[in-house]
A protein has these predicted regions:
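Phosphate-group recognition and catalysis centered on beta-loop-alpha active-site segments
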Residues: 1-242
Length: 242
């Protein structure tokens, strides 16, 4: 059975502050195949790494991410003295050594702002000539569609929470309608039947975010293509022992 790809979550959130350059280095050190990052726009339109809509939980700042300039965010402490990095910072550090999966955070009711985020991220990818080692991920199918229409050479994934039965068919249909290549599904609902259904439609299956050997073993048996984990070093070591 083929081994799944090792994909760090929020860079490597269980090994370094989430969405920081320290996390990028942890993924690289672990020999990860890919790394998922969360991307939003600063007030001056620069793609930066941040999971939450607000800064309160993970930095020493407060308020919405989009209310702060890039300079303010880079002066913040995102954990252990790490600044909030820009997407450009991350792409420069990675330089093609792993795939950078950019999860684009949608803003409900603000389609124009979402489009600006898609366009800004793709522009950074273009500037770094990173089309072959970058990908777009989003819970928002419209953002996936815009990304694929704008830059077909960059692969795209629709993210989903738990799905079962007809919900799986609807998810796969939504992906293919938007010319995407993969789904990223919350791990508890993943089973062999779901993966087989996706494979029949030539859809890649990622899963998030299991951190235990028991779950990794189950997901490998199910046939997933990649595991998004907070602990890429541990997953890499586990796969090396199999």
């Amino acid at each position: 059975m083929a081994q799944p790809l090792v994909i760090g979550h929020a860079c490597a959130a269980g090994e370094a502050p989430a969405n920081t350059l320290a996390g990028v280095r942890a993924c690289l050190d672990a020999g990860a195949d890919a790394m998922e990052i969360d991307v939003q726009l600063s007030s001056d339109g620069i793609p930066v790494l941040m999971h939450d809509e607000t800064l309160d939980r993970t930095t020493n700042l407060s308020g919405p991410v989009r209310s702060r300039s890039c300079a303010e965010l880079q002066a913040a402490d995102a954990g252990d003295g790490e600044p909030v990095p820009t997407l450009a910072d991350v792409l420069a550090l990675v330089d093609g050594r792993l795939t950078v999966m950019c999860e684009l955070k949608a803003t409900p009711g603000e389609a124009d702002f979402d489009q600006r985020l898609v366009d800004a991220v793709l522009a950074d990818i273009e500037r770094r000539d990173a089309r072959t080692w970058s990908a777009i991920h989003s819970f928002n199918p419209d953002m996936v569609a815009r990304a694929r229409a704008t830059q077909p050479r960059v692969s795209a994934t629709i993210i989903s929470g738990p799905v079962q039965g007809d919900e799986v068919d609807r998810l796969l249909g939504a992906l293919l309608k938007r010319n995407g290549q993969a789904v990223s599904i919350e791990y508890p609902c993943i089973d062999r039947a779901l993966v087989v259904k996706a494979k029949r439609r030539q859809v890649t299956v990622w899963t998030w975010t299991p951190d235990s050997e028991e779950e990794w073993a189950r997901l490998i048996e199910a046939g997933v293509d990649g595991i998004i984990t907070n602990v890429p070093h541990k997953l890499s070591a586990y796969l090396a022992r199999r």
